[in-house]
Amino acid sequence: MNRRKNDFLVRPKRIRCYTQLSTLPIDLIIEILSRLPMNSIAICRLVSKQWASILQSSDFTESFLIKSPPRPRLLFTIRYGSKWHLFSAPQPRNFDENFPVVATDYHKGFSGNWCMQSFQLVNGFIYLNNRLSLKGKIDRVSVIWNPSTGQQIPLPDLGVKNSHSKSFFGYDPIEKQFKVLCITSSKEHQVLTLGTGRKLSWRKIEYSYPHYPRKKSNGICINGVLYYRNTNAMIVRFDVRSEEFRFVEIKMYVEILSLINYKGKLGVLFPNTDLAQLWVLDDTNKVEWSKHNFVFPDTTFEAIRATDTGEMFCASSCWRDSLYVSYYDLEKESVKKVKIKGIEDKLSIGKHHANEFFIFPNHVENVMVL
């Protein structure tokens, strides 16, 4: 607006700033961008090649994790109709936290014949298989996916003919490297390392004891070590960094329900008619276990898992109007239920059942680009 001063017409001055991002120190740029929320970072990657390069650097990734330490979340994968849907909800940091109802965030819906039995969640990245029909032949395509950035990395073919394979996804926190271990029925062991900047390729590794994992064993990565079930009464221990195998004997001749991360240690769940039993591997060298018994109020659960703070939880496998997650504190021997809101509204499930439903703990947002 123009103003008059002493009968003279005074026009407001417009000040323009011509400072370019390229003139600012890189450290300052990283400091500014690392304070942005995740959805804004995804948009900033599209601004310019320079911004994309900065946001893909290891310096930015480390700065972002320091400025915005990720709070673990529950990840829900639901197949409804012909489509998969991904939701997440806050995970309690303290068993005494009082929030009987939590809202979910909707991340993405995607089509395809995805095999969620192969689903493995490690440090914000997801490994899963898609079954494709190519020229009348069913083929599997393995993909590493970061739901936070949207990056999808199809893995190269193993190059092994007429062989079934089983893969496990792990992360080395020291070298900050993701690796995929693949074991074929021909007893070949191969490893693929991601994020090296070179073309992805499989390489064979040495092993001292021929073995093949159980079909339903997805395995779990804990502090740089992959654990998965063998066909015998033992668990295989694979060090992601050194790529060495060790074997942990289980003197319990019943079917294992699942392997879990219990407060940074390997937990083995055994089913029972009246209660569940948890074995915790307290000493990996001496193979010493501590044992815990517990009972869940809901017997029709999808699976029993554990949060990063040690609460056991499960979600009902049959739900319509509302989804509840039950948490169990082993030390206090107490149970609480949390209502999960938003899934039924987004999918308009109503009285219909979801076709398939899986829940995974300890998901964190990761800005890393492999």
Curated annotation (Swiss-Prot):
InterPro entries to which the protein is assigned, alphabetical: F-box-assoc_dom_typ3, F-box-assoc_interact_dom, F-box-like_dom_sf, F-box_dom
Natural source organism: Arabidopsis thaliana
Residue span(s) of domain F-box: 18-64
Superkingdom of origin: Eukaryota
PANTHER family: BNAA05G37150D PROTEIN-RELATED, F-BOX ASSOCIATED UBIQUITINATION EFFECTOR FAMILY PROTEIN-RELATED
Protein's recorded name: Putative F-box protein At1g46984
PROSITE patterns for the chain: FBOX
Cross-referenced Pfam families: F-box (PF00646), FBA_3 (PF08268)
